[in-house]
Design a protein with these regions (language model features):
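Conserved redox-active cysteine motifs that mediate thiol-disulfide chemistry
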Residues: 47-48, 55-72
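Oxidative protein folding and maturation machinery
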Residues: 1-41
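Thiol/disulfide oxidoreductase modules built on the thioredoxin-like
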Residues: 103-105, 112-158
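Alpha/beta-hydrolase fold active-site loops
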Residues: 50-51, 130
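Conserved hydrophobic packing residues within short motifs/helices of P-loop NTPase cores
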Residues: 53, 85-87, 110, 133
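Active-site acidic short loop of glycosyltransferases
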Residues: 47-49, 79, 105, 126
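Structural microenvironment flanking redox-active thiols in thiol-disulfide oxidoreductases
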Residues: 65-103, 115-122
Length: 160
């Protein structure tokens, strides 16, 4: 009873609920982002394939380094049924576009704007980027916080 009004307790309770919501075994929360063409794309549009969901930004050097691994995975496994949805939090749209071109990121791209960014980051409990999830064809989260060789190995095993 005493904890019910305690701010620290409520923050921890909310964080635990968020982490449970986006843990492996849970359905990936659906959201929309704006595409390079100015349309909207939803995570639900990618059902039917395995998806690497990659939250990043052009100014984030660890994100840019990770995109090299994601590109290798995409090139190796896209034909087998793997897709990538990279979702940027960039404020500078030109920097976002340039990074995509410079890094050869030919897969699905989206950018979050304003309140939608805050909403999606809260939905997924994102406190830092890169933040990566792997989602199965039914929309269920099957991997989280995998990067580099661990992400490559995990995704390769999906098609063994």
């Amino acid at each position: 009873q005493q904890l019910a009004g305690n701010r620290y307790y409520l923050d921890m309770k909310n964080r635990a609920e968020t982490l449970t919501r986006v843990a492996p075994g849970s359905m990936a929360p659906v959201f929309t982002a704006i595409t390079l063409e100015g349309d909207t794309v939803s995570l639900a549009d990618l059902r039917g394939k395995y998806v690497i969901l990659d939250f990043w930004a052009s100014w984030c050097m660890p994100c840019r380094a990770e995109s090299v691994h994601v590109k290798e995975i995409y090139q190796k496994l896209h034909e087998k049924g793997l897709d990538v949805f990279s979702v940027s939090s960039d404020k500078d749209e030109q920097a976002w576009r340039k990074a995509i071109e410079d890094d050869g990121m030919v897969w699905h791209q989206g950018i979050l704007r304003g309140k939608n960014k805050k909403h999606v980051y809260e939905l997924y409990g994102i406190v830092g980027i890169p933040a990566i999830w792997v989602i199965d064809p039914d929309g269920k989260i099957i991997g989280k916080n995998l990067r580099g060789e661990k992400l490559k190995d995990f995704c390769s095993r999906l098609f063994d």
